[in-house]
Each structure stands twice: as C-alpha cells, then as structure tokens.
Design a protein with these regions (language model features):
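Short, intrinsically disordered, charge-balanced linker/junction segments flanking boundaries
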Residues: 1-4, 161-167
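Generic, well-ordered alpha-helical scaffold segments in large soluble proteins
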Residues: 2-6, 61, 80, 84, ...
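Active-site-proximal structural scaffolding
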Residues: 70, 74, 79, 108-111, ...
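Active-site activation/catalytic loop segments of kinase-like enzymes and analogous catalytic loops
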Residues: 105-148, 166-168
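Extended hydrophobic secondary-structure segments that form protein cores and membrane-embedded regions
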Residues: 75-77, 99-102, 159
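Catalytic activation segment of kinase domains across protein kinase-like and atypical kinase folds
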Residues: 83-121
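ATP-dependent phospho-/nucleotidyl transfer catalytic cores
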Residues: 1-78, 89-94
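All-alpha amphipathic helical-bundle segments outside canonical DNA-binding/catalytic cores
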Residues: 148-164
Length: 169
C-alpha cells in the first residue's frame, strides 16, 4: 500500500527526496559508465565489438528512460525491490506478511519500477511471463481498494515495460 498512499502526490509531500527524472539521473550515470568500463576491462575478451561500442547509446537511452519514468504518475517507491530485500512472514496472526529491507534507494518515481524489479528478480522468465498480466491486474485491484482510481491494467503494463527499461527509443 506504499504506492497507493502517496499516489500522484509524493513530489509535493517529499520535495527534497530524490526523483527519478531530476535528481537521480546525473549522479547515477557515472556508476553505470564505470561499471560498464570495468565489465569491458574484465570480460571484454568475450564480447563482440558491437556490444562494446553500445555503451554510449545505452547510457543515452537509459537517461531517456529515467526521464520518461518521471513523466508517469509518480509515488514513493522502494527503488530496489528484489527478492533478497523482501522478508515474507509465515502467516501467523500479528506478524507482518511482508517486510521490506534496504531502503537506501527510496525515491519518487514510476511505481511499476518496484513491481518490475520484484517480478524479474523473483521468478524465472517463463513463469513470470505466464503470470505477468495476472500480477498487473492484481496490483491495479489493490490500488483501487486503497482509493486510487483510473489506473488501468493497460497503463500498468505500459508503465511496467518502462520500469523494466523495455521501452527504450
């Protein structure tokens, strides 16, 4: 319910918080570029020249994707929802069913980034693809129960694809 609570108003409630389309992009890019250079230095021997030459285009595309994430309805997101940052309870009364860890990447962004990262880190590709539409529909249902209106499964799918960096130009 984190996303629903701040849906469309997180920017105003957290004006100093990092935002995907403004304060996050430029500080993040040197890390991407440095990681890419290190990867080429250590593993370049097994990469084709076209992969090695793709770095500038990838970085430019990633900047664009981050900006476009900020053009969506934004809310407060965890920013690093992976299976290893989630603890699942055992269903006993009084225990939280899910606890999120590692809040260092919290920001204001497209909420589907969180869902995209979780589903892609927690399921094998075939299983995820088979049930993605169900997950997105359930997410939209939960938003509606929490008072968010007008967010369709089609919009969720579009935002989800962008959150996965699958909507590059």
């Amino acid at each position: 319910d984190l996303h629903a609570k701040f849906w469309g108003r997180a920017e105003g409630q957290f004006p100093g918080m990092m935002q995907i389309n403004t304060s996050y992009i430029e500080p993040f890019m040197p890390g991407v570029e440095g990681t890419w250079r290190n990867c080429i230095a250590q593993f370049g021997y097994c990469m084709t020249p076209d992969v090695i030459e793709a770095m500038p285009r990838y970085v430019a595309g990633l900047r664009d994707i981050m900006r476009r994430n900020g053009d969506r309805t934004m809310t407060l997101i965890h920013g690093d929802v992976r299976v290893d940052n989630v603890m699942f309870g055992d269903g006993k009364p009084g225990l939280a069913p899910v606890v999120m860890l590692d809040w260092q990447a919290i920001m204001v962004s497209n909420p589907m980034q969180d869902l995209a990262w979780l589903l892609n880190s927690g399921f094998d590709t075939e299983l995820r693809r088979k049930h993605e539409d169900e997950f997105l529909a359930y997410y939209c249902e939960r938003l509606a129960v929490a008072g968010v209106s007008g967010y369709s499964v089609n919009q969720a799918r579009d935002d989800y694809d962008l959150g996965l960096d699958r909507k590059s130009t």
